[in-house]
Amino acid sequence: MTPLKVEDMDRESVVLSFTIPIVNTGRQIGTIMDAFVRTYLPFEQYDKASVTVTLTAADTPRDDGYWQAFIMEIRKPKAFLIKLAIKGKSGNILRDLENFPDMPMDIIYQVVARSDYYYAKTRITLTSEDLRTALYQYTSGVRK
């Protein structure tokens, strides 16, 4: 996983991104027909911001929410690009994210090969420390 990076930020929201490597370890090529990310941040746990996530192939990014299927060659690495749009509720995104908790996310993808298709799931966690580090690096760079 690449480090979390701020793509854009204004007073009320922030867009962050990172990539996750994927490799076909099977014995034949396969196709990723569908993929999406589900975040686990219920408002009972954290209600100061809302999170929207998009997932695309890193080498062919899209911003329309459409998943473009791609072929996975055997042992040839590719990467998923994950973008998080976080919108604060108070009008000050930095204040809203001060106590942002660790946020689990599932990457769910449909694989098709010669056998029947199946869904696979990988869980990753966006830690509050990773978020603070990305925000600090961005805001300190903006001030220079």
Segments predicted by a language model, with ranges:
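Acidic, serine/threonine- and proline-rich intrinsically disordered appendage/tail regions
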Residues: 1, 60-66, 70-77, 95-144
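Solvent-exposed residues in well-ordered beta-strands and their adjoining turns
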Residues: 23-25, 40-42, 85-89, 110-112
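Generic structural hydrophobic/aromatic packing signal, biased to beta-strands
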Residues: 35-37, 82-84, 105-109
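N-terminal topogenic membrane-targeting module
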Residues: 1-71
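Short Pro-Gly-centered flexible turn/kink motifs
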Residues: 74-88
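Residue-level signal for secondary-structure boundary sites
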Residues: 28, 45, 90-92, 113-117
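Short, surface-exposed loop/turn segments at beta-strand-coil junctions that are enriched for proline
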Residues: 87-97
